[in-house]
Amino acid sequence: MNTPWTHTTVLLNEAVEALLSGSTAATGTYVDATFGRGGHARAILARLAPEGRLIAFDKDAEAVAEAARISDARFSIRHQGFRSLGELPDASVAGVLMDLGVSSPQIDNPVRGFSFRFDGPLDMRMDTTRGESVADWLATAELQQIAEVIRDYGEERFAVQIAKAIVARRQERGAISTTSELAELVAGTVKTREPGQNPATRTFQAFRIFINAELEELQQALEASLSVLQPGGRLAVISFHSLEDRIVKQFIARHSKEVYDRRAPFAAPKAMKLRALERIKPSDAEVHGNPRSRSAILRVAERTQEV
């Protein structure tokens, strides 16, 4: 089981196997687009040939510091979000791995403000060196915007009620500044309970996704992968909630079929850019050992010859 400040990599073997196409001595350049605490990266390096390369991305300074512990000339990391994937040369990469969401050390560190389980500043930024925190945003955000964020990114049916409570609290006692304050406010507003779920779960998810522009960055990174992947290169994406998975699923589906131009019905169709391969869920044993893996879905696709 996980303990605070540790991280168990989800779908470790399945993701690396899919990324490397079963190779035990891969020679190409691979990308770990979300380094986190390096579980996937270390497993990839263990299966790279001496001439292989691994480029990692992460916007979290703590993740970059962890990456500095890897002493391997084949490895490099960039302190950037994975939307910067497109800065790599076209058709230069043999595989891209994206492990979406928040790592256990981020969730379990009260200072980061990601979890309602710990009292801490209401921050939630992946990159604490830039941008505004959730607390800063809530101090001035309009009721309608707050409600839309909770509804769209948290899929919360009580979004309007929660937004009204946040604004009322701000007007009466000042803005919310801690995770406990937000969790208690939501618990007092949402009267129904989903079995096994804290009533603040959806609101915390919504604010984290919004403040980090996670879905927009995911869409940009997926599009960039089409450019940087070489023919036969693999795209492997692990998602943890329906919003992420829907984007990944639709992206792969959209690029896995020939496209016809309605304005030129007799013209040859544009070739598909991806070939969908697998959809993998964690085993029962993995979920038992790491409950945080239960919602994970790994989708795998392969770049076609069309570049």
UniProtKB/Swiss-Prot annotation:
Q: Which GO terms describe its molecular function?
A: rRNA (cytosine-N4-)-methyltransferase activity
Q: Does the keyword Heme apply?
A: no
Q: What are the GO cellular component annotations?
A: cytoplasm
Q: Which residues bind S-adenosyl-L-methionine?
A: G38, G39, H40, D58, F82, D99, Q106
Where is this protein chiefly located? cytoplasm
Q: Which UniProt keywords apply?
A: Cytoplasm, Methyltransferase, rRNA processing, S-adenosyl-L-methionine, Transferase
Q: Name one GO biological process term.
A: rRNA base methylation
Q: Does the keyword Transferase apply?
A: yes
Q: What is its EC number?
A: 2.1.1.199
> Which InterPro entries does the UniProt entry name for this protein?
RsmH, SAM-dep_MeTrfase_MraW_recog, SAM-dependent_MTases_sf
Q: Which domain of life is it from?
A: Bacteria
Q: Which reaction does it catalyse?
A: cytidine(1402) in 16S rRNA + S-adenosyl-L-methionine = N(4)-methylcytidine(1402) in 16S rRNA + S-adenosyl-L-homocysteine + H(+)
Where it sits in the cell: the answer is: Cytoplasm
Family membership noted in the UniProt record:
Belongs to the methyltransferase superfamily. RsmH family.
Q: What does this protein do?
A: Specifically methylates the N4 position of cytidine in position 1402 (C1402) of 16S rRNA.
Record's NCBIfam families?
A: 16S rRNA (cytosine(1402)-N(4))-methyltransferase RsmH
Protein name from the UniProt record: Ribosomal RNA small subunit methyltransferase H
Q: Which organism is it from?
A: Variovorax paradoxus (strain S110)
